[in-house]
């Protein structure tokens, strides 16, 4: 199984509880035979989605931004069987780095809607990887 583990914590090793928890998860996955690559989003240049929909109209499936997301991360995401989104909990959700990554996967869906039983959705351009969310809150409760 090919796994891409995305760590969106802005903190480095030793300070990041997200990274600590992710490392334990990855260790177990590797012991079980998974091929896991960890990517620290804080070290990557990911421009924000600007909602231009070029990836749907002018260049279907391709974002107009030329950055680490387009050139490296999106292809790895597409080729993975499983992707781990590891993020600290900031203001009730994933942090801005992870949100930017997720928004930049917009080229992976098509611009029209289709009915799927009890809901309406955008059809996928290709089979998406399975997603696991590892959300970490550093406050003791």
Regions found by a protein language model. Give the residues of each.
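N-terminal beta1-alpha1-beta2 submodule of the flavodoxin-like/Rossmannoid cofactor-binding fold
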Residues: 1-110
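Short, glycine-/small-residue-rich phosphate/pyrophosphate-handling segment
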Residues: 110-141
């Amino acid at each position: 199984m090919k796994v891409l583990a995305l760590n969106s914590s802005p903190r480095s090793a030793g300070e990041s509880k997200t990274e600590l928890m992710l490392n334990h998860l990855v260790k177990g996955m590797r012991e079980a035979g998974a091929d896991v690559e960890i990517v620290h989003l804080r070290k990557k240049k990911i421009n924000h989605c600007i909602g231009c929909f070029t990836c749907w109209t002018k260049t279907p499936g391709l974002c107009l931004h030329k950055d680490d997301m387009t050139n490296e991360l999106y292809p790895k995401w597409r080729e993975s069987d499983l992707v781990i989104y590891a993020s600290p909990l900031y203001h009730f959700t994933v942090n801005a780095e992870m949100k930017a990554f997720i928004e930049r996967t917009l080229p992976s869906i098509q611009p029209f809607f289709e009915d799927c039983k009890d809901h309406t959705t955008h059809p996928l351009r290709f089979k998406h990887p399975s997603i696991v969310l590892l959300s970490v809150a550093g406050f003791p409760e």
